[in-house]
Amino acid sequence: MITIIGNSVAGIGAIEAIRKVDKQRPITVISKEPYVAYGRPVISDFLKGKAKEEKLLSYRRKDFYKENNVNLVLNEEIVDIDVKKKKVISASGNEYKYSKLLIATGGVPFIPPFKGKDLKNVFTFTTLDDAKKLLSISKDIKKAVVIGGGLIGLKSAEGLHAQGVKVSIVELMDRILSLAFDKVSGSIVENRMSDVGIDVYTEASTEEILDDGQGNVRGIRLKGGREIEGDIVVIAIGVVPNASFAKKAGIEMNRGILVDDHMETNIKGIYAAGDVAEAKQFLYEQKMLLPIWPDAYKQGRVAGYNMIGIERVYDGGLAMNSIELFGVSTISAGAHTPQNPEGYEFLIDVDEKRYRYRKITLKDNKVVGFIFVGDIDRAGIFVGLIKDKVDVSSFKDKLLKKDFGFIDLPCE
């Protein structure tokens, strides 16, 4: 009996790997949400009104679970693992046995202990239900404050803006998307957001969510005393691995659940994959959280094969972010902005007026990272250069050319 906790992309990857080889082994999938697997990256399209719920829920065929002989249990949250008896226990007291277990529970919103965080009309934005709540209330409000200028914050802001809401974004760092952008690219996207009417406050620390005296939100107060009005507040500072129950069971954790190259934890027969897992990072072969959709699927497949005795090795993920904001496409990957720039080389082409920026980061004549804004064509080639550790010294002068392509690569 294989039991999978979590019903998103990593769990789906595991199911498909298992069923490719073994059509009969019992699989139970347990999810605390009421939905079949859906495309979490596109909940922002739902909020914008560009995607219906049916589209989100079509990540896999309607009969996917039946066709793959999967016992799907919805609205059931697992809160404990009994390692000795090989069973998991839900909040409602139900027990599910396993011979092999995959933890694919993803992440949960990180909520700092702000005063006022429990007021009415304080939201998060990581699930379809979150998007439904924001879409519903957007028709009755005029202003929103989004705390956090990362991917989740910007996509929630874009969705609310599309519904006619005046949005203010508050970000602690000196730029939005601080993990994906450097200062120049962050500034370009900030300018685009300002052009469409979104206010962006960087290097701004939220001190309190303000009460209107009736238990409702009226805005936030920053350190220093400045107040920003809002009928709702979206807390979008980031996510943390949803793994407290795993820690209780003795599973080793750092920031996430630590796994080996087979996606197995320190407890034999228990695996982890996706946003909850801390796995090998490709570039430096160190373990880290990589909350990236394709990598979560890949990790799930590796775990699935290994759970049925077919050895597969996870070769590591690459930090990568791809996002379109208000018509400006962006993608970044790898170590594009190292903290210590010594020993690195940077190739840069920028046109801020046209919202365009290309930065390629090299070390020892190898591409280790890049940021593209506005023009993201051929990004896949650069991902390949990073993963294959190609020496680019013979064609380095061509890397920034608009028509750079496979024809420019060495033949061998």
Where do the language-model regions lie?
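FAD-site-proximal beta/loop scaffold in flavoenzymes
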Residues: D118-K139, D211-R221, R226-V302, S394, ...
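A Rossmann-like FAD-binding core segment of flavoenzymes
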Residues: Q24-P26, K66, L72-S90, Y96, ...
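Residue-level detector of alpha-helix initiation sites
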Residues: S8-I12, P34, G107-P109, L128-D129, ...
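Short hydrophobic core segments
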Residues: I5, Y96-G106, I147, I228-G238, ...
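C-terminal catalytic lobe of FAD-dependent flavoproteins
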Residues: M1, R218-I220, R226-E252, V328-P410
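Mid-to-C-terminal Rossmann-like scaffold of FAD/NAD(P)H-dependent oxidoreductases
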Residues: N7, K20, V276-R378
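Glycine-rich dinucleotide-binding loop and its adjacent helix/turn
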Residues: T105-Q163
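Beta1-alpha1 glycine-rich phosphate/pyrophosphate-binding loop at the start
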Residues: M1-N71, A157-A180, D377, I381
